[in-house]
Structure formats: C-alpha cells, structure tokens
Design a protein with these regions (language model features):
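Terminal alpha-helical segments
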Residues: 1-103
Length: 103
C-alpha cells in the first residue's frame, strides 16, 4: 500500500467514525442523556476535522492542536463560518467537563 493509499484509508476511516459518533449523539439525545450526546457530538466533529486536515496533508495528534487548526485554517480564513468554531469550542468544553469531572 502506498502512502497516499494509506492516507486515503485513514481519511475514509475518520469520516466513517464521524458518522458513527454523530449517530450515537443522536441516540443519546433522544434517550435523554444530553451530556453523553454532547461528548459524542464532539467526537463526531473531531473525526470529521481530522479527516479534513489529513486530506490537506496535516496530521494532528492532540485535541488542542485540532482546535487551533480549526480556528487558524478554517474559521480565520473564512472557509468555515465563525459560529461553527464556537460550537466546536463549546463541545470541547463539555467534553472536558465530562471526562475530568470526577478528578
């Protein structure tokens, strides 16, 4: 498998993971578990953004790096409307509270 083929496989996998996480978020919301729905929605966005950036040749290994790239490469350049950056930031905040609440 060539590096380009491997990258295409990871992009496809990340895109599919995004769909899976989004479906999980919808189920949790319908089940009345909004905190878990927000956590799953965050991961849907995370995987979709990872696929987008990987397609552009950028590999990001940290949540904070992905968040920075979202704002620098998509929001500030006008490729994505500013409210979507706020949505992602809010989901990231909810995820952090959910994951680290017991600590």
């Amino acid at each position: 498998m060539s590096p380009d083929e491997a990258r295409a496989d990871v992009i496809a996998w990340s895109s599919e993971r995004s769909r899976v996480w989004l479906a999980a978020a919808e189920r949790e919301l319908e089940a009345g578990v909004p905190q878990l729905a927000a956590d799953h929605a965050y991961y849907a966005c995370f995987h979709l953004l990872s696929a987008i950036f990987l397609k552009e040749g950028l590999t990001l290994n940290r949540h904070s790096a992905l968040r920075s790239a979202l704002h620098e490469r998509l929001i500030q350049t006008g490729r994505l409307e500013r409210p979507w950056g706020s949505v992602f930031d809010r989901l990231a905040e909810l995820r952090t509270k959910s994951v680290y609440a017991a600590l």
